[in-house]
């Protein structure tokens, strides 16, 4: 089925060419399985990452609405906030970020290095809060305050994860299908599942482009019971935007994010070290390290549907390594 309705949505061009899809020979030998990686960690802006795909659509909508300020939220070490700030700088917009400290640490490295350091370079107006308990409401309240100061704010949800932003990962599914055509018959795709937009967009795109390929989301912050409704809701919202059906089952693995969001674990850090030492590729302790731990364990536990090639979606996040230095 065609995804031609994607072209109806205004989109800014931040990425340019498709990101590389690479074979990992040494990692594949180590695991005894063909492993490929989609390098969304090397998107052009602000040290790379997946959120730029979403921001191509979201920032276009902000400009269409005449906004002069991007307002968003996340953790102190949020990759999404960093990339939103870079987009704002590139477009000459103001950026206001509502940040929380999800792990409750007072470690200076976490509070000032990594992504947080980059926010200062991008001249972001940072507002701290105790917790993002109801981020949509908190962002609306912040936008109201910003508007009262004479700005024209555009609210971007946590992770850029709404139906419009998730279109960026329908676009990514198109790239993946084109890059694999005639070259590799993917059995499975593995992605970190957090704010759910990346996962949902891929789910819609892959269902229509590579229907025999299973998509597995490795949760980084929630149990399956809590995460699945979020992914399904976005999956259906994206499908409605594109006037498509979305019947693919959402598969999630939740055994790899403990002790909680933003706190590294041993398996995740081992995955970070393994890929660095075998392939010279940097994962991160919060998202991709834990997702890769799921991939590694999934192979050893025979959780994948067959023995075919696996594609890992590298969503970026390496700047956080510097903030988590004692764990690395």
Curated annotation (Swiss-Prot):
Record carries keyword Lyase: yes
Ranges in a coiled coil: none
Enzyme's top EC category: lyase
The protein's required cofactors: pyridoxal 5'-phosphate
Reaction(s) the record says it catalyses: D-cysteine + H2O = hydrogen sulfide + pyruvate + NH4(+) + H(+)
EC number: 4.4.1.15
Molecular function GO labels: D-cysteine desulfhydrase activity
GO biological process: D-amino acid metabolic process
N6-(pyridoxal phosphate)lysine: residues bearing it: 51
Database matches in CDD domains: ACCD
Record has Transmembrane as a keyword: no
Pfam families: PALP
UniProt keywords, alphabetically: Lyase, Pyridoxal phosphate
Function as written in the Swiss-Prot or TrEMBL entry: Catalyzes the alpha,beta-elimination reaction of D-cysteine and of several D-cysteine derivatives. It could be a defense mechanism against D-cysteine.
Subunit annotation: Homodimer.
Family statement: Belongs to the ACC deaminase/D-cysteine desulfhydrase family.
This protein's name: D-cysteine desulfhydrase
UniProt organism field: Escherichia fergusonii (strain ATCC 35469 / DSM 13698 / CCUG 18766 / IAM 14443 / JCM 21226 / LMG 7866 / NBRC 102419 / NCTC 12128 / CDC 0568-73)
Gene label: dcyD
């Amino acid at each position: 089925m065609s995804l031609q309705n994607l072209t109806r949505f205004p989109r800014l061009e931040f990425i340019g060419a498709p990101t590389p899809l690479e074979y990992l020979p040494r990692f594949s030998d180590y695991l005894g399985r063909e492993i490929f990686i989609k390098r969304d960690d090397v998107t052009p802006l602000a040290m790379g990452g997946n959120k730029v795909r979403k921001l191509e659509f979201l920032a276009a909508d902000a400009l269409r609405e005449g906004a002069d300020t991007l307002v968003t939220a996340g953790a102190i070490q949020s990759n999404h906030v960093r990339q939103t700030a870079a987009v704002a700088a590139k477009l000459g917009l103001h950026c206001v970020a509502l940040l929380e400290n999800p792990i409750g640490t007072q470690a200076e490295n976490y509070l000032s290095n990594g992504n947080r350091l980059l926010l200062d370079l991008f001249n972001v107006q940072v507002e701290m809060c105790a917790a993002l308990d109801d981020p949509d409401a908190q962002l609306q309240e912040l936008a109201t305050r910003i508007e009262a100061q004479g700005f024209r704010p555009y609210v971007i949800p946590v992770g850029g994860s709404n139906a419009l932003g998730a279109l960026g990962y329908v676009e990514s599914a198109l790239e993946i299908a084109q890059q694999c055509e005639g070259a590799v018959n993917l059995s499975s795709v593995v992605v970190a599942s957090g704010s759910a937009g990346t996962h949902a967009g891929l789910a819609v795109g892959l269902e229509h482009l590579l229907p025999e390929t299973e998509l597995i989301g490795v949760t980084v912050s929630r149990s399956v019971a809590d995460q699945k409704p979020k992914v399904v809701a976005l999956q259906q919202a994206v499908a409605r935007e594109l006037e498509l059906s979305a019947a693919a089952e959402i598969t999630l693995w939740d055994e790899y994010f403990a002790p909680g969001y933003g706190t590294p674990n041993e398996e995740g850090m081992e995955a970070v070290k393994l890929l660095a030492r075998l392939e010279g590729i940097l994962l991160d302790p919060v998202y991709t390290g834990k997702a890769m731990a799921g991939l590694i364990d999934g192979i050893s536990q025979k959780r994948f549907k067959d023995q075919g090639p696996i594609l890992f979606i590298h969503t970026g996040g390496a700047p956080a390594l510097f903030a988590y230095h004692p764990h690395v």
